[in-house]
């Protein structure tokens, strides 16, 4: 089963399978050349609410353009720090302080990437095997004497249940998550640092099998979870400590008895 993909990827998949038109590059060049004329025509001729919305859109685009130009100018400015590294040893968290201009450029690039809705996130496991409902749920028969009612389900896979979770009355509880299969911590590996740390799980962001499994907090292979990385001491460019980051489960927790994940950086 594939993880949810962005809608724009079907165009790329088509181009990989069937190729592009012979005049594709020429059409793209002409379309880009016409954009300025189209924007000018819309700005002059639109009326009413459409004109107001269009002006708001153009205003935001111009702000982003000015920010990008300013970031580029900051990137080109030479740093006042000396070219040769100092002989005095520095602790690990102060090594990047001398490269202020590079940090500004990197911060601007990250913000631009977040602003783009079509930004793609590379995950360690882009594909996972599907899990049937028969394998995921076990039917629990209920009924005072006959035990003929079979609307309850017991989850047979590991799950994460938050500390603020309160059970419903037993009579109305449809999905049962056994205490023995509940996990609160995961062994998270940082791909760049090459270290593995046991971190608390904050929540389940996305289970690729089914939105219902995401809501129930089921931990299967390929699930995106949020972990508490405050112990790692990761900080942003502004100096704030990063509290939570996403990680993807890479093992099969129900077979291994533990949750192993790779941090998404």
Curated annotation (Swiss-Prot):
Basic and acidic residues: bias regions: 20-40
Recorded GO CC terms: nucleolus; preribosome, large subunit precursor
Alphabetical list of Gene3D superfamilies matching this protein: 2.40.10.310
Localization annotation: Nucleus, Nucleolus
Transmembrane segments: none
Biased composition range(s): Basic residues: 55-69
UniProt entry tagged with the keyword Lipid biosynthesis: no
Subunit structure: Component of the pre-66S ribosomal particle. Interacts with nop7 and rrp1. Interacts with rsa4 (via WD repeats).
Name by which UniProt lists this protein: Ribosome biogenesis protein nsa2
Source species: Aspergillus clavatus (strain ATCC 1007 / CBS 513.65 / DSM 816 / NCTC 3887 / NRRL 1 / QM 1276 / 107)
């Amino acid at each position: 089963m594939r993880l949810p993909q962005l809608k724009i990827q079907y165009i790329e998949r088509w181009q990989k399978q069937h190729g592009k038109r012979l005049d594709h590059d020429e059409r793209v060049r002409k379309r880009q050349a016409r954009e300025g004329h189209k924007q000018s025509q819309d700005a002059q001729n639109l009326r009413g609410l459409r004109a107001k919305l269009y002006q708001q859109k153009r205003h935001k685009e111009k702000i982003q353009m000015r920010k990008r130009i300013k970031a580029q100018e900051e990137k080109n400015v030479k740093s006042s720090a000396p070219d040769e590294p100092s002989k005095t040893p520095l602790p690990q968290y102060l090594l990047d302080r001398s490269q202020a201009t590079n940090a500004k450029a990197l911060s601007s690039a990250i913000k631009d990437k977040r602003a783009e809705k079509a930004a793609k996130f590379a995950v360690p496991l882009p594909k996972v095997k599907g899990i049937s409902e028969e394998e995921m749920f076990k039917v629990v028969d209920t009924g005072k004497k006959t035990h003929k009612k079979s609307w309850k389900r017991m989850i047979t896979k590991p799950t994460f249940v938050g500390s603020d979770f309160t059970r419903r009355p037993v009579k109305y509880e449809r999905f049962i998550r056994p205490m023995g299969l509940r996990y609160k911590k995961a062994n998270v590996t940082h791909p760049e640092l090459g270290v593995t740390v046991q971190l608390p799980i904050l929540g389940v962001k996305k289970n690729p099998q089914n939105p219902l499994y995401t809501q129930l907090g089921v931990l299967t292979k390929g699930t995106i979870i949020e972990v508490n990385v405050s112990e790692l001491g990761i900080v942003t460019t502004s100096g704030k400590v990063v509290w939570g980051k996403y990680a993807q489960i890479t093992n099969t927790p129900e077979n291994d008895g533990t949750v192993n994940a790779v941090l998404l950086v």
